[in-house]
Structures are given as C-alpha cells and as structure tokens.
C-alpha cells in the first residue's frame, strides 16, 4: 500500500473492504459509543471540537500523530461521499489505489468537481449562507499571518465556483504543508470568534471556512488538480440545493 484514504464517519455504516480506505470515527470524544473504528480522540487531538471543526478533527489527528508515515499519498472522503472510480462498492464505483497512483503521476491533488453557484460569487454565497463577519475576519487573519495568500483569497472570493466537502488525495508532503497552514489560520479564527450564540449548523464554522481555505491554498500554490465526480451513496437532491441557494440569496 502506497496510499491511505481516511473515511470520516460519525455513525456505523458500510465501508469498503479495501486497505486503501480506513473509516475514522470523528468526534469520538463527544460520545460513549464505540463502533470499533479508528478514533480521532487519542494522543494529540481536537476530537472534542468536532461540532465546530467537522471532519477536520480526523485530519488534525492524522497530521499530529503521523498516521500517514508509511505511505506516499493521503486523502479524506466521507462515509457517504467518495471519489468516482473503477472499484465496485455498494452499488457505485469508487476510486481505486491503481487510479490514485496513475492520476497523481501527472497531478498534484485530486479534488471533487467544483460546485458552481452561477448567480453569485463565492463571497456572496458564504455571506448569504453564513455570517459575513467570519469571512471578513478570516481575510484579516490571512493578511496578518500569511499575507502571501491574500491575493489568492481575494481571487477565490470573486469566483463563482469552488471545491467543497474537504475531500482530496495528495502527497504526504503537500498534506503536511496544507495542515500547517490551515490550522494556523483556523485556530486564530477560533480565538477571535464567540460561538455561544451560533446555532448548531452555524457553529460548524471552521468546517465551512476550511472548504474556502482549501481552494485558497490550491490557488496560491499553483497546484495542478484533477477534478473527479463525487459519488454520493445516499443520492443528492439537486433541486432542493438550487431552491435553498435562491432562498438564501433573495429571502434572507
């Protein structure tokens, strides 16, 4: 095995019986339930912050505890969302290790196909769906702590599409570099944000913001990406997504 992909989950589910994929119980520190999966709550972890950091608690744990030390390529998917590929699984076909090795010969990062907002920018979409002040604060933090990323942030905000879900596969070296930068920004944002008045959905702030920051990191580092369709094992209601997009934009 030269690759390892973590599958973030918060519940018992069906997972590929393939050593490429390893389910990891995110937010395990917040529950007494043990599904028998790898947990994000041992050694150095932020498992207890899962309600705010979402699947990032798995990434932080893997990064800080050198989980990927024996492989060259690393990644993250979700219990119901995988990259499309040629490996049969649960009525779908998902990414195989052979494809990972092949695709990453000519690309730096495997990413989900972009979500296109069509009628609004990345910036206005975030402001309609979440809180503008958090986006403004994140931009300020980047200007203060990582000014070389400021132009990439501004560029992304003006675009009308981006990669979502915090799904990727990349080299271990790129992963370590990304984690170091990402958590520097997010932990500073955490220091400056009072979540006490956020409802459970909006309290997932750092998960939402990291989706934007992932794109900023890709842009700034001029990384060559390969877009891959996302297989949603539970299906996806695109009409409902379109309705909610319009509702947030015009009825907020």
Specify the residue positions occupied by each region the protein language model found:
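ER/Golgi luminal nucleotide-sugar-dependent glycosyltransferases, focusing on the catalytic module
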Residues: 1-252
């Amino acid at each position: 095995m030269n690759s390892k992909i973590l599958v973030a989950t918060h519940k018992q589910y069906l997972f590929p019986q393939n050593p490429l994929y390893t389910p990891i119980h995110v937010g395990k520190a917040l529950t007494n339930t043990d599904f028998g999966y790898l947990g994000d709550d041992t050694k150095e972890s932020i498992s207890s912050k899962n309600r705010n950091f979402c699947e990032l608690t798995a990434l932080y744990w893997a990064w800080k505890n050198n989980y990927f030390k024996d492989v060259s390529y690393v990644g993250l998917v979700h219990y119901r969302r995988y990259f499309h590929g040629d490996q049969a699984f649960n009525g779908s076909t998902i990414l195989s290790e052979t494809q990972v090795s092949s695709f990453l010969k000519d690309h730096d990062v495997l990413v989900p196909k972009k979500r296109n907002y069509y009628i609004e920018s990345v910036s206005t979409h975030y402001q309609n769906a979440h809180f503008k002040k958090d986006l403004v604060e994140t931009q300020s933090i980047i200007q203060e702590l990582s000014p070389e990323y400021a132009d990439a942030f501004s560029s992304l905000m003006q675009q009308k599409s981006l990669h979502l879900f915090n799904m990727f596969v990349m080299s271990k070296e790129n992963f370590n570099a990304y984690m170091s930068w990402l958590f520097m920004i997010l932990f500073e944002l955490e220091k400056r944000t009072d979540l006490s008045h956020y409802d459970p959905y909006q309290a997932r702030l750092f998960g939402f913001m990291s989706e934007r920051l992932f794109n900023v990191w890709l842009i700034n580092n001029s990384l060559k990406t390969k877009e891959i369709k996302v297989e949603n094992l539970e299906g996806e209601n695109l009409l409902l997504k379109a309705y909610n997009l319009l509702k947030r934009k015009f009825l907020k």
